[in-house]
From Swiss-Prot:
Basic residues bias spans: 34-43
Region (Disordered) residue spans: 1-102
Organism: Microcebus murinus
Low complexity composition bias: residue spans: 1-18
Gene Ontology molecular function, alphabetical: DNA-binding transcription factor activity, RNA polymerase II-specific; protein dimerization activity; RNA polymerase II transcription regulatory region sequence-specific DNA binding
Entry's localization field: Nucleus
Cited Pfam families: HLH
Classification lineage: Eukaryota, Metazoa, Chordata, Craniata, Vertebrata
Superkingdom of the source species: Eukaryota
Region (Sufficient for transactivation activity) residue spans: 158-188
Coiled coil residues, start to end: none
Keywords recorded for this protein, A-Z: Activator, Biological rhythms, Developmental protein, Differentiation, DNA-binding, Myogenesis, Nucleus, Repressor, Transcription, Transcription regulation
Domain bHLH span(s) in chain numbering: 105-156
Listed name of the protein: Twist-related protein 1
SUPFAM superfamilies linked: HLH, helix-loop-helix DNA-binding domain
Length: 199
């Protein structure tokens, strides 16, 4: 019996069947692994698209499309911001000419006041020169006119103290003024003016 079993050859049909049964068993695990990898990769890709990165990518892609509503809203917002900035610039530009005009008016008013002050001062000095007896060669400046006026007042005080004028002559203002003018001119020419002015 042992010889029959050992010596009995295996038919090629049985070998082909056994080989065919073994081959699918060997081939199934790799195919299953490959399918699992493909499914995992597809799940990962789907998850990446649905995740934060996918959402961000989709948002950026949607913003890049020219006809997307998101871009239209952003464009409107940016246009509104630009309009607001332009309005602010126009308001500031409108305020600057007003300040410049105010400065100009202030300068004009200051110039007018200075001219009035100078004119009134010149008129006062002209009136003082008419009162003070002067020589034909006198070309007095303002400070010289003030000094001469002070000396003339001092001279009048001395005249009143000396009682050189008579009561009759003093009653006539015109004659008294003429005599005082002459006496003051003589007093100046004698050097009293130069001596007193030097002090």
């Amino acid at each position: 019996m042992m010889q029959d079993v050992s010596s009995s050859p295996v038919s090629p049909a049985d070998d082909s069947l056994s080989n065919s049964e073994e081959e699918p068993d060997r081939q199934q695990p790799p195919s299953g692994k490959r399918g699992g990898r493909k499914r995992r990769s597809s799940r990962r890709s789907a998850g990446g698209g649905a995740g934060p990165g996918g959402a961000a990518g989709g948002g950026v892609g949607g913003g890049d499309e020219p006809g997307s509503p998101a871009q239209g809203k952003r464009g409107k917002k940016s246009a509104g911001c630009g309009g607001g900035a332009g309005g602010g610039g126009s308001s500031s530009g409108g305020g600057s000419p007003q300040s410049y005009e105010e400065l100009q008016t202030q300068r004009v008013m200051a110039n007018v006041r200075e001219r009035q002050r100078t004119q009134s001062l010149n008129e006062a000095f002209a009136a003082l020169r008419k009162i003070i007896p002067t020589l034909p060669s006198d070309k007095l400046s303002k400070i010289q006119t003030l000094k001469l006026a002070a000396r003339y007042i001092d001279f009048l005080y001395q005249v009143l103290q000396s009682d050189e004028l008579d009561s009759k002559m003093a009653s006539c203002s015109y004659v008294a003024h003429e005599r005082l003018s002459y006496a003051f001119s003589v007093w100046r020419m004698e050097g009293a003016w130069s001596m007193s002015a030097s002090h």
